[in-house]
Structures are given as structure tokens and as C-alpha cells.
């Protein structure tokens, strides 16, 4: 891939256009209304469609960290348009496209930051980054060419995407790298009522000449109380290179929020009203079917046994096995994962999810990437309908499974489409043109 200016200057302009499509056993999608039936999968979230996932444009200058003589600086501005804006959106920054309109397509300035290289701080120097940047941990990445596959793991879909603040990365020596920073929280801008002063600390230990790396990260250090995506999250990621063509990555996280509203509390109208203590969503109502709370107790329990709020945790583990072949012009991608959304706060349904994916990357020159894949998702819901069927946790609009839970478990509402559906099979592919 060549930048627009032919890489002749330290300031680069480049980008890509990514178009994707899929065929899925989940068939309740209405893309024009933002109903994404492939959830909890991402980014191929709209089933049985062809879509513009990303049209991305980069403006950047990369600081020179190969020298120790002098200060240097860099910057990046990334402009993104497409369906994938719904994953990168930060509350308070053009977020009405998603949180009010639930639009299929949207625009997001996903990165805008300044880097300052400090060569004398640490044996390997330090970089201070200020602005909006990609959240530090994770195997996967939001921007299409930076990811192994077209789709993303469920683990990645429901954790932190971006932060706005400052981070210092220091290479202590050839083995240890330390990162620390401060922000208003995950996917939240500082001028919103959801903003919380939030710290983060990550440590990476690398050994055997880079063949092994262990990253430990506390990504959100604050009070952990309910707010927009205010996830207290602990990460452990391990990378191992077997040889020149095979490697594996494994990631585990445990997340939680405290004092999360109970979707089934009898006085939900007052609890869910937008206020300083419950600032999200931007649009709200008095019903119990809002999709931002948790299933704190069994929905079939009487009102007297339902708590107003609860502790809502979840854990997940994902593994990738990667093999490069054809002189690094193609790769085999294998992903396996388990996610336990204990209180349903992330996906909308208290359930254990397993997902398995096999895919390929094929490069045609330096301009075209083609990534086909086949994935299977199975969920094990923790509740059943009055006639004993499992509550739906696939083929339902992202986050709205709570509404289906109420209708099915309590038996007092219209039967939702997709009732009892607990698995999905998806054949998907994307094509990326780099410029």
C-alpha cells in the first residue's frame, strides 16, 4: 500500500474502503432501523446484507523513536464513515447518530492525538500521547487492516473501545514496558455527565527475543459505579510465536459495573429517568424494556424480591491461532472463545456464549485484501420460557434481548421473533481497497 503522497514526506495521508457481506441463519435484521440480528457478533452485525463497513482516511506523522538523541513528535487524525461507527462511537461526540437515531451508517473521528517522544525517559525512551486513542489492551483493533479477521470476538465487542486523555508509554528495558494514563472513562467524552476521572496501568513483559509477551492491564481505575460503559476491567493477554509462520494470542478479561439498574424492578420508571446518577440513555422512557440495565434476579421472582440495583460482572476468554503462508501474502485465522454475561448487562441476556471461527486473509499485491470466514455461535441462556424453551439470545437486535426476556419469561407480552433461538451460523467476507 502506498500513501496518497507516495510516502515522500513525513506527513502521510492514506486510507481504505472496506465492503463486507454475510449470509446468516439469523434473519431478523432491519438494517435501515439499526436492528442488527447477528449480535452479539461484530462487525458483520447486520445479517444477510452487503454493507460499507469502513471508509477511513488517515492524516499522520509518526515520531522517530529509533534514535535517542533528540525530542520528536507525531500526530494522527483518523476519520471513519460506515456501519462500524456504532462500535467506535464515544458518548458526547456525535453520539446522537447511534444513541438517538440508531442509524445504520455514521461518522466518527475515531482517533485524534498528539505524540511527544521523550528519548531520555527510560532506557528505550517514552512516548506521551494526548487526545483520543484506541484503548490500550486487546488482541483485536477497531480499524479493519489492523485486525486478523473481518468479524470480531464477542470478548472484544463488549469491552472498552476508545478513550480521551493522556497516556505515557515507557520502555524500561528490552523486557519491560509500562503504560499509565488518565481519561474520563471508556467511550466517554469529558463534558458528559457520565465522565469519571479514570486511571489505567498496563505492564508488558517480553522474553525470548519477542517470541513471548505477557500484558497485564487495569484499564479503568475509578469507583466502578454505573455510567455509560463505565467498565472496571482487568486484562491478561499472552502472545507466543512458535516459529516464523505460526503464533497464538490468548486474552482474558473480567469486567463489572456496580449499582446497575435492575430491568425488572417494579419502580423502574423513576429509576431510569435521566439524571446525574442515571445519565444514560440520551432517550429514555418509563418502561422496563430499556436495554441498558441488568437482570439482577430471576425475572419470574415477585417484585418484593427484586433489588433496585446490583453488581453486574462478566468474564471472557478468547484464543487466536494464526498461520502465515504463501510468503506472507495469506494467513489462516482460527478463533475460539467463551463469554459469560452473568447479569446480561453487556449483551442483554444472562447467558454463556461460545463462538468458533475459521477464516483466511488473502493479499493481492499491496492494494487489495480479501477475508472470508465461517463462524458458529452458541448461547446457553440462564432462563426458560413458561413452556420450557430457552430464552432467545441470538437473532435479536443488539442489546434488546432484555425485552424478549420479559415477554418470554413472564409470559405477559407479545411473543418476540426469534423465540428460543440459541445458535447461529454465519458465512462472511470483506474486501478492503487500500489507497
Residue ranges: model-predicted function:
Residues 4-25, 29-188, 193-200, 204-208, ...:
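Outer membrane beta-barrel
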Residues 41-44, 88, 98-102, 210, ...:
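Outer-membrane beta-barrel pore domains
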Residues 51-56, 107-111, 161-163, 196-200, ...:
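Transmembrane beta-barrel architecture of outer-membrane proteins
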Residues 184-187, 222, 255:
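A short, flexible beta-alpha/helix-coil linker loop
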Amino acid at each position: 500500500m502506498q500513501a496518497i503522497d507516495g510516502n515522500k514526506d513525513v506527513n502521510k495521508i492514506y486510507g481504505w474502503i472496506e465492503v463486507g457481506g454475510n449470509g446468516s441463519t439469523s434473519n431478523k435484521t432491519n438494517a435501515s432501523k439499526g436492528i442488527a440480528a447477528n449480535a452479539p457478533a461484530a462487525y458483520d452485525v447486520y445479517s444477510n446484507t452487503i454493507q460499507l463497513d469502513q471508509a477511513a482516511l488517515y492524516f499522520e506523522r509518526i515520531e522517530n523513536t529509533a534514535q535517542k538523541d533528540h525530542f520528536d513528535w507525531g500526530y494522527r487524525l483518523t476519520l471513519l464513515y460506515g456501519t462500524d461507527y456504532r462500535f467506535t462511537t464515544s458518548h458526547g461526540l456525535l453520539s446522537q447518530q447511534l444513541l438517538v437515531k440508531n442509524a445504520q451508517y455514521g461518522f466518527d473521528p475515531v482517533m485524534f492525538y498528539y505524540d511527544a517522544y521523550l528519548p531520555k525517559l527510560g532506557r528505550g525512551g517514552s512516548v506521551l500521547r494526548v487526545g483520543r486513542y484506541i484503548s490500550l489492551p486487546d488482541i483485536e483493533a477497531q480499524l479493519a487492516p489492523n485486525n486478523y479477521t473481518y468479524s470480531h470476538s464477542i470478548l472484544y465487542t463488549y469491552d472498552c473501545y476508545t478513550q480521551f486523555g493522556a497516556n505515557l508509554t515507557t520502555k524500561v528495558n528490552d523486557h519491560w514496558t509500562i503504560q499509565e494514563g488518565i481519561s474520563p472513562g471508556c467511550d466517554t467524552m469529558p463534558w458528559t455527565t457520565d465522565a469519571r476521572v479514570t486511571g489505567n496501568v498496563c505492564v508488558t513483559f517480553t522474553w525470548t527475543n519477542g517470541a513471548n509477551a505477557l500484558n497485564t492491564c487495569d484499564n479503568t481505575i475509578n469507583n466502578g459505579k454505573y455510567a455509560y460503559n463505565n467498565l472496571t476491567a482487568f486484562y491478561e493477554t499472552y502472545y507466543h510465536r512458535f516459529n516464523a509462520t505460526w503464533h497464538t494470542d490468548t486474552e482474558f478479561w473480567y469486567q463489572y459495573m456496580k449499582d446497575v439498574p435492575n430491568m425488572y424492578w417494579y419502580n423502574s420508571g423513576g429509576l431510569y429517568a435521566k439524571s446525574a446518577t442515571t445519565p444514560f440513555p440520551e432517550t429514555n422512557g418509563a418502561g422496563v424494556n430499556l436495554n441498558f440495565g441488568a437482570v439482577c434476579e430471576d425475572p419470574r421472582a415477585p417484585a418484593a424480591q427484586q433489588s433496585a440495583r446490583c453488581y453486574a460482572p462478566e468474564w471472557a476468554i478468547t484464543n487466536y491461532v494464526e498461520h502465515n503462508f504463501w510468503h506472507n501474502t495469506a494467513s489462516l485465522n482460527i478463533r475460539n472463545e467463551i463469554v459469560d454475561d452473568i447479569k446480561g448487562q453487556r449483551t442483554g441476556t444472562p447467558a454463556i456464549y461460545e463462538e468458533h471461527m475459521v477464516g483466511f486473509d488473502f493479499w493481492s499485491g499491496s492494494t487489495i485484501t480479501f477475508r472470508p470466514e465461517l463462524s458458529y455461535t452458541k448461547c446457553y441462556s440462564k432462563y426458560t420460557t413458561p413452556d420450557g424453551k430457552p430464552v432467545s439470545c441470538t437473532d435479536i437486535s443488539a442489546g434488546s434481548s432484555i425485552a424478549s426476556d420479559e415477554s418470554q419469561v413472564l409470559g405477559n407480552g407479545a411473543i418476540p421473533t426469534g423465540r428460543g433461538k440459541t445458535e447461529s451460523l454465519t458465512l462472511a467476507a470483506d474486501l478492503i481497497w487500500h489507497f
